[in-house]
Amino acid sequence: MFIVTGGAGFIGSSIVKSLNERGITDILVVDDLTDGAKFVNLVDLQIMDYMDKDEFITQIVSGQDFGDIEAIFHEGACSATTEWNGKFMMENNYEYSKDLLHYCIERDIPFLYASSAATYGGNDTFKEELKYEKPLNVYGYSKFQFDQYVRRIWEDAAAHDETLPQIVGFRYFNVYGPREQHKGSMASVAFHLNNQLNAGENAKLFEGEHKRDFVYIGDVCKVNLWFFDNNVSGIYNLGTGQAESFLEVGQAVVAYHQKGEVERIPFPEHLKGRYQSFTEADLTNLRAAGYKDTFKSVAQGTAEYMAWLNR
């Protein structure tokens, strides 16, 4: 059996889909469906069972035996970079992750989890090293602190010559693609621009030359499953390694629709200083781990995404 936390969410449900494509259906999806709109992500998927996140945490903490677990893909988190309730964020993203990690260590279960490029904050170097990690918001801090916790676990195990199961964290950069529609304001810029053009408006982008490392969801799933297949541990950047501008996203959306144009709007005051204006994954460690596949460009990924959204 596989367990996917956040399995009704964007990345989680996409991993479930990728497992289904391998013929794997013995999957326990864990999520919080208080936002009932997320159920849409599960409609076309084959799963064995669904469990509410709070019930799952209770069972994990009490040491419940779930039977033979091949791996846990831990994608469940509060991913809103605009959320400033630190207590809520640390409970959701840090304490929950620690409980799951120890459950996996005690039972020798591979643990593949979602970290984030938000751990780097306003840096212009995006390499998996402490000196480059300075998060700008409490979401990034919660992810950073769990990465630090994992590093201490590795150090402690090495000092005592202990063997650990696979533990791998992926620092997701700007992921976009199918199954993110429930995220509202946190959905990708491509999603919002598509809605604007379908409403007869122009594609509105903030002023400035902001560039991000936009990575297509299909590539994110491929990396997750490659690491599971190859039993490699570590913390790795998961982006394309190539920053592209929001303008290029806008142009790709306009090119698909063959109408409208990119329109510039003022950058919101409340986001200044709390917003990464540039991200670009350093893929040195990912490539050294053995992952060789290429990543879709913004033009390629956006075209595929637009075809899915407007199907």
UniProtKB/Swiss-Prot annotation:
The active site is at Y139 (proton acceptor), K183 (proton acceptor). Substrate binds at N174, S185, H192, F206, E207, G208, E209, R212, Y275. Binds 1 NADP(+) per subunit. Its cofactor is NADP(+). It catalyses: ADP-D-glycero-beta-D-manno-heptose = ADP-L-glycero-beta-D-manno-heptose. It comes from the Bacteria. The keyword Magnesium does not apply. Keywords: Carbohydrate metabolism, Isomerase, NADP. Its EC number is 5.1.3.20. CDD domains: ADP_GME_SDR_e (cd05248). GO terms for biological process: ADP-L-glycero-beta-D-manno-heptose biosynthetic process; carbohydrate metabolic process. NADP(+) binds at residues 10-11, 31-32, 38, 53, 75-79, 92, 143, 175, 183. One of its GO terms (molecular function) is ADP-glyceromanno-heptose 6-epimerase activity. Disulfide bonds: none annotated. Pathway: Nucleotide-sugar biosynthesis; ADP-L-glycero-beta-D-manno-heptose biosynthesis; ADP-L-glycero-beta-D-manno-heptose from D-glycero-beta-D-manno-heptose 7-phosphate: step 4/4. Homopentamer. Belongs to the NAD(P)-dependent epimerase/dehydratase family. HldD subfamily. Contains a large N-terminal NADP-binding domain, and a smaller C-terminal substrate-binding domain. NCBIfam families: heptose_epim, PRK11150.1. Catalyzes the interconversion between ADP-D-glycero-beta-D-manno-heptose and ADP-L-glycero-beta-D-manno-heptose via an epimerization at carbon 6 of the heptose. This is ADP-L-glycero-D-manno-heptose-6-epimerase. It comes from Psychromonas ingrahamii (strain DSM 17664 / CCUG 51855 / 37). The lineage of its organism: Bacteria, Pseudomonadati, Pseudomonadota, Gammaproteobacteria, Alteromonadales.
